[in-house]
Amino acid sequence: MEIIDNVLSEKTFNNIVNYTCNNNDFPWNLVQNGVSVAGDGKYQFVHEFRSETGVMSPYNYLLRNLYLRLGVNTLWRCKMNLKIKTKKTHVFYPFHQDFTSLQVPFTTVVFYLNTNNGYTLFEDGTKVDSVANRMVMFNGNTKHTSASHTEGDRFRFVLNINFS
């Protein structure tokens, strides 16, 4: 596992944030189940830059410099999650691997687009705080989960990338 701060230049990072997080016209889809248990009330909004079926978003070009920085050879999936601030206590989703059927080694990156008190938690107890322009890179088979944020901005933005 590797944690890297200031992943992108300020200009490149702000360009991504302005076109996605700060853009009222950026398209989001409501996902009510995801890795949660159906009916548990947990949900998030998602924009898929590259879906598991290979469909590419017209906004995928925004991430070109990030893909180059990561050394992406094959992009399996890339999605941005928008999570809404919760009251008083963190909400956790179940521990999961992003792909259980992928038969090749792959890397997962969680890239944080804003700073808040949400975080990524790993099954071994490691906690990585949501800090803007920070990423955590790890083996794709590593189980992890997210903790909602309870302070700061109304929304938490996280980019999730799976590649080899």
Segments the model singles out, each with a brief description of its role:
Residues H90, V128-T145:
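Conserved metal-binding segment of the jelly-roll/cupin
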